[in-house]
């Protein structure tokens, strides 16, 4: 079992129980798909705003701007490896996720779930630096999200 620790820095995120439920659903679907249900680990999430995300992005990636999600693995993993006792940290920026959801015609909760799945996959060693890696990661995301009744996030709006 992977335990979830959450820090909510911004009241605009709303109800902590709803955020926990979304996170738990994303985590369970991801670990089920990757056959990691027997793993014991810990996941931390920071729900913050664009200003704080820009600070973190500058500090760790030298990019002075907010982004939707950042992942910080506790231990470097290759895709398919079992995680250690601490999976890592995921940071989410509310304003960016709200903006993207509106621009892409998605519900906020569906897009947030996608960003959490995306972050978890990064912590588990998946990446999108090459076309092959991006394809593999996107396919996993689509499969995981489909299991929890969320449409393909990569479908273009017409």
UniProtKB/Swiss-Prot annotation:
GO biological process: rRNA processing
GO CC annotation terms, alphabetical: cytoplasm
Keyword line: Cytoplasm, Endonuclease, Hydrolase, Metal-binding, Nuclease, Ribosome biogenesis, rRNA processing, Zinc
Cross-referenced SUPFAM superfamilies: Metalloproteases ('zincins'), catalytic domain
InterPro entries linked: MetalPrtase_cat_dom_sf_prd, YbeY, YbeY_CS
Major subcellular site: cytoplasm
UniProt-listed Enzyme Commission number(s): 3.1.-.-
Keyword hit for rRNA processing: yes
Cofactor note as given: Binds 1 zinc ion.
One term of GO molecular function: zinc ion binding
Cofactor or coenzyme needed: Zn(2+)
Residues that hold Zn(2+) according to the record: 118, 122, 128
Localization: Cytoplasm
The UniProt record lists the keyword tRNA-binding: no
Family classification: Belongs to the endoribonuclease YbeY family.
The protein's role, per its UniProt record: Single strand-specific metallo-endoribonuclease involved in late-stage 70S ribosome quality control and in maturation of the 3' terminus of the 16S rRNA.
UniProt name for this protein: Endoribonuclease YbeY
Organism: Bartonella bacilliformis (strain ATCC 35685 / KC583 / Herrer 020/F12,63)
Gene this protein is translated from: ybeY
């Amino acid at each position: 079992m992977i335990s979830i620790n959450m820090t909510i820095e911004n009241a605009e995120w709303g109800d902590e129980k709803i955020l926990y439920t979304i996170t738990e659903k994303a985590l369970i679907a991801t670990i089920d798909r990757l056959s990691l249900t027997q793993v014991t680990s810990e996941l931390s999430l920071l729900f913050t705003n664009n200003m704080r995300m820009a600070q973190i992005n500058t500090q760790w990636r030298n990019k002075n701007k907010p982004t939707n999600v950042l992942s910080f693995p506790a231990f470097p993993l290759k895709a398919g490896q079992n995680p250690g006792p601490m999976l890592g940290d995921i940071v989410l920026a509310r304003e960016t996720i709200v903006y993207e959801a509106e621009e892409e015609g998605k519900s906020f909760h569906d897009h947030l779930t996608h960003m959490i799945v995306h972050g978890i996959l990064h912590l588990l060693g998946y990446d999108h630096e090459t076309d092959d890696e991006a394809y593999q990661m996107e396919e996993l995301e689509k499969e995981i999200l489909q299991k929890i009744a969320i449409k393909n996030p990569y479908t273009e709006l017409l």
